[in-house]
Amino acid sequence: MGNSFEIPIARRDFMEMTGMAAAGRIAADTAGEPGTVSTAADKKENGTIKYAGREIPVLYSVDVCVAGGGPAGTAAAVMAARNGAGTVLIERGVALGGLAVLGCVYPFMDTHAPDSDTPYVAEVKERLRQHGIEPFDGVTQQTWHNPETLALIYDEMCAEAGVEILYQAVLVDTVLAGHAITACIVQTIAGLAAIRAKTFIDGTGDAFLARAAGAPYERGYEKTGNNQPLSFRFEMGGIDVERLYRYVAVELQEDWCKSRPPYFEIAEAMHRKQRYKLEELMARGVESGEITQEEAEYMQAYTIIGKNGVMSMNCPEIPVRFSAADPVSYSKAVTYGRKMMHHIADYLIRRLPGFEKAFISREAAMLGARESWRIRGRHYLTEDDYHDQSRFPDAVCRTAWFIDAHGEKVSEKLPAGGFYEIPYRSLVTEEIENLIVAGRCISASFILQASMRIQPTCMSIGEAAGIAAAWGLSRNIAANEIKWDAIPAGKRSYVSAEKAKK
């Protein structure tokens, strides 16, 4: 049922892209050759570098270093390794998947663009099936998954491709030589260390690697300076989902509920005045003083496949006065958001049928940042590209998710069947020659980013970043000089729908 993008591809190329030919690529006795990883544990010549007045060890010397193990970064690492590059993936947590796993952002929204699934995205969905998680509900096009299963799948994909994962490693800084990054500095469980690489991919979501290297960037809405609001998502267990379904779909006759358990969701969005039936319930809570207007503004919940009686809560939406790009404000948002979370949960337990025995079973390990920093790259995507449904010869994916700018009075949709494309040039900058940026922090305006930020699109961008990194290294082409449309079609994850309109 999922969207699928098909390109002509030779069997051998397909095997390389899906990791079947990855075995044996990482060999310690050939450090320095393409497709190898040299680690401090088995290669003394990795040595040390001087940083901040002291010598620190070099943990890895690799072809490609990816910072950030979210949807984009994981895809980039897997595809770089599958295409022959020795690859290290840095992740600050203890699981890959980013917001999908650590942030409770669930499920994957649909791009609404026909044939948008690139091979990597289609593979993730198929692997969910192989693990007993059917991602489609038969009605909607969103991808239902299971966070813990998804983390396992990403581990498996990295292991099969030969990606070295460095968990609990926080990116600290970069080391530059001219217009190239030569190493990044990370804080590990053992202290500061360096990773040398020929090409670096920023999958941090916050453009941290790019900013540390001196790439130009911007943040927030050009008109107000505000970031999109943060969320502090959580899960609730002990829910009688069938009772909840009967109440919402039968008693309230909420026609918005298209699917039924085990695939079921509820929602209300008072701030958008969409007149969901549950808005009345939340409004009564405001009137009685049980919850605040801020807490009642937005509430959404989804059942989680493989977790009976558990729902993923897409709330609270933290007020826009808290910033995703200010460390002090962000920290205060955590405290404020947790209070909102408990108020909402307590109110639902008291007032929403089916929640009588519910409880908070898990809170996200990171806030949900919809938007923070974005690079200024060789092509700057704007809302004009959205409205014009722009096509590019170097397009790496397509999407049609609506302009979903929380906190601003902006919400627009393309006509059915419409879409725009994202060019490779939006992933690279003029200033840093061996840097590729993947995910929600690519070169785009605030409004356009509100459309391309969803996880399947970020996966496709990361997929292309990994392919491009490996291809450029194999031909000694700088990352910011790569012509995506010069890569043979059979090796690309996406081929533009048509010649560029611009």
Regions found by a protein language model. Name each.
Residues V175-A194:
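Conserved beta-strand-loop-beta-strand element in the redox core of flavoprotein oxidoreductases
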Residues G73:
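N-terminal Rossmann-fold NAD(P) dinucleotide-binding loop
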